[in-house]
Amino acid sequence: MRVTKGNDHLKVKAVAGTRVVLLAFDMDEGSREGLLGFAVKRGVKGHEQTWLRGTKYFRDLVPHPHPKDDYSSREQPFQTFLWSDYKAFADTDYDFTIVALYGDIHAFEERHTLEFSIRTEAEDDQHHGVWFNRGAIASHAFETKFHNKRLTEEMTDNVSDDGKLLDPETEWLSRGLAEACLKYINETGPGEGLRVCAYEFTYLPILRALKRALDRGVDVQIVYHDTKKDDDANRAAIGKAELPDKVVHGGQETQVLFRRTRTPIPHNKFIVKLVGGKPKRVWTGSTNFTDTGFFGQTNVGHLVTDADTAKIYLDYWAELSGDPTHSIALKNATGLTPNPPNVIAKKSIAAFFSPRIADNMLDWYGQRITDTTTLAMMTIPFNVAKTILAALGKKRDAMRLVVLEDVPAAEVTAAEKANRGKLAFSNGAILGKSFIKYKVGGAKVVPIANSDLDEWFVEEELARPTNNGHVFFIHSKVLLIDPLSDDPLICSGSANFSTNSLTSNDENMLLIRGNTRVADIYMTEVDRIFRHFRSRDIINHIAEEGEHNKWLELDTTGAWIGPNFKEGNYKNNRRQLFFPEADVGTWSDQAAADPNPFADEKERAAAKKKKKPPQG
């Protein structure tokens, strides 16, 4: 939901997702002098409002701060023109009061007060359900709330049969994601069906929920990745959950488990639900069925209630259940989901399955980035593909904000510098520490030497083990095009934005056009993740240079305001996203005139085939 409110001096644009309410402010030039910040008050509709809190303070008012302390925004205002409330609940009506504070910090003067109401989105409106986990496992909040408690298998597996997470740490990290997946399985009744396609399939509460579904008469069939190794983790978990290879219902034997062995990365993570023998819903997204998927790295679960979409996924599942060779899998994926047009139909959902003969879909994504008129946002778990970087790096008026798993490569940093103020990257980070990955998997965490960060901030730690794995922070695969417009494009699913993902793996993506509710949820969440890591990237970089800073002290001089209204500045460009001076249209206006990105698909595939070394 979106709300705009204003007077002659102050404007606010509020965007509500499910668990985030984003607030953007704009101030008339004549009212900026002497502005000390904004106080924000919020309450459930019809109930008392309370001042929201932050961690920054005026030194004169807080001479002896503690890193764990927070402060009322009425006493220590927010000195920013973009602020988000991360403690909202889904499907709830809220009243907000925004007050601009001026004068003496010992006796603030309130001016230009604005009041408005907004409703957060329901997690599932019976068309699209969207759940993002916390995705910020190393954070100020996790330390102050749970003292950086290390996650254990006992904690993550502590789940009731009805799908409630009984451990407070895992419940906080899940943020409804694991619960939604468990509920989806648990609500399936006798005679209904579930078709599971799983890459990593080791989170026992999910497997046990599927076993209980079998026991109550649900037709459960599972395609899972089998490496054929003796210590295969999926097979071990299946054994622990006592999921049978076959079952007998009404005297008829039915296969339950189907091994996927003929591709190195069968990367899907979806579950189709059948009612009355017909596909009705599909759970998909980026979340592997693992404890790390639900409680560690950033992930999204996306539930679509649409018979046509569910049918396409069911047909895909049926093809994969036969463990096809690469050539057959490629033919099946292309047959089920032909290459999309540059402009998919209004108010539509299109699926896109892999493998494909070539990586031209990267060109399609790149064109959509270039077509963006206001804002493009991405989450990229691995390297930035050259095609994607070329699109991101083009000189454009639109802003481009990208969250990476790893520290940007030199060419990524160069693109950012060439588009300063318009293109910005953030990457997975732990405040005050360097995170060094090993190529074979795992990582080591090293404190930044000679920094004073421990005087200002609590110590953040990654609550999951670092001795194995390749993705610790960002695992979602999301592309948002003009998400603040009335015609947004949302791309989300299992597929990394890479050549291998397109040409080698089993993958699925959803392309969703024109759904502003879904766009608001995704935008507020990707913005949350982007800003969480960007602040840590910046602070760590400055600390590594040996600089010291008064990190949490508020400004009494008014200098904080200037960058928000300086032409070309990142903060000014960000503010203007919410208060545009003119209507610039949307991505679809330009996309219709773009060339066909798949025109050379066969030639590209043939060239790739020639480059392959001879076998044997």
Where do the language-model regions lie?
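Short, compositionally biased low-complexity segments enriched in polar/charged residues
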Residues: 172-187, 202
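Beta-propeller domains
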Residues: 337-412
